């Protein structure tokens, strides 16, 4: 495997709307981000991934782009953005931008033209179809509830939108559209950015004819994902993008890919194939949902998590590269999800960080994760802002599902869990804004905030800092091979990494009960040292056998015998 900077990096995701408000309007902005760069430098991250800051009507918080080459007024100006890039580079960090090209806003100039007439030169930049028997062209559901088609009276046809009706899908079969996209990507790269995170990039190729999905009783619209995820031309498009754009720069690329399998990821990230560096897969964050999808709650089984993460670790070894993440702007907070955000918040957050960051791949930290921010439990649906949450609530209430049932799902899985503003200190609104925040701050900001974390040498923040530092000091964390141990243990997630005559042993108690670790005989470390632990007081005893306290994590490094 070749050495590239993105393999040795740790990435920090900023959701600009919720990070830091500078001008007091209650909305995070670019000058706010600039004011916090020294904090990120202290943490030690190498790369900042900036969620969309492009001009947008904000139907889906910036993932509906009106102008790919302009900055959203609420966030600042292009001059502010250029200052941000320069300040990031001055501090020895890099910047990757969100690339949202499965769809645009319905207010984008291309779509405004496209809907004017059937023979408009921009008509085929989008996916237009006549209705079928007085109804939509097919039975696909939008990811945000309802039909994936909207009727447009001007031309009497429907346009496809896999997300909201203000996010029409772009037609990647049109070579002119692809040229425009590549030109726009090149424009940003020439400004000096260091790569892209590509939003739902495996949705861009649809199956010819856009066939109906398998109907389901009582459901007028059903997921058409079999016909647009990982579609027939996806590899062709990505290889063309690589040839026209990506190969000309020293970049990091990561493709967000719902429904991607390991076998497909081997193709998307295979070093010989010239597509992407890595993908975001969703297998491990789907393990706590029932058969009816995201809002259908079920407890996580540790054995499932071990099997899933280990399969991806082994499956991309020597072929491609893994992304490592627990959190992002669409996922609930990990300490609330897989940890204990009450009795063992600090211990479980550190354990989950250790478990992930010692694996092979590029770790991604989402803002607030490094201080153990938790899910929020708003009482009223009016307190929520997320379009996915609000549409789901409205649809399910109309079907007679009780308010309490829906709120339990929203408290566990709603995207606003990740979007409550960053908690900087104990002052009003957590130091995020002097105005009224666009989304309420989690009421626990007085106990959980950056100021408190920086004062406490045992905070979650310093544990993340240590994990990032260890990755820089020990090549085994970047390059070592991965093997799961104690596969059937119901409470311990343990694995080893091996590289260059060294073995790293990672042992994590996944629960709030005491449990005993017995190291398998085949794992032998000579001259072992305890590199990291999330408990203060030293317990005597060797790496071969010890008692694990609630959510305890230990990392040992030794030589191979």
Curated annotation (Swiss-Prot):
SMART domains linked: Aamy
Top-rank EC class of the record's enzyme: hydrolase
GO terms, molecular function: alpha-amylase activity; oligo-1,6-glucosidase activity
UniProt keyword annotations, A-Z: Cytoplasm, Glycosidase, Hydrolase
Recorded catalytic activity of this chain's protein: Hydrolysis of (1->6)-alpha-D-glucosidic linkages in some oligosaccharides produced from starch and glycogen by alpha-amylase, and in isomaltose
CDD domains according to UniProt: AmyAc_SI_OligoGlu_DGase
EC number(s) on file: 3.2.1.10
Record site feature (Transition state stabilizer), residues: 330
Family matches, as InterPro entries: Glyco_hydro_13_cat_dom, Glyco_hydro_b, Glycoside_hydrolase_SF, Malt_amylase-like_C, O16G_dom_2
Alphabetical list of SUPFAM superfamilies matching this protein: (Trans)glycosidases, Glycosyl hydrolase domain
Active site per database record: 199, 256
GO annotation terms (biological process): oligosaccharide catabolic process
Origin: domain of life: Bacteria
GO terms under cellular component: cytoplasm
Subcellular location: Cytoplasm
Membrane-spanning ranges: none
Main localization category: cytoplasm
Family: Belongs to the glycosyl hydrolase 13 family.
PANTHER family: ALPHA-AMYLASE FAMILY MEMBER (PTHR10357), OLIGO-1,6-GLUCOSIDASE 1 (PTHR10357:SF184)
NCBIfam families: PRK10933.1
Protein name: Oligo-1,6-glucosidase
Organism in which the protein naturally occurs: Halalkalibacterium halodurans (strain ATCC BAA-125 / DSM 18197 / FERM 7344 / JCM 9153 / C-125)
Gene that encodes it: malL
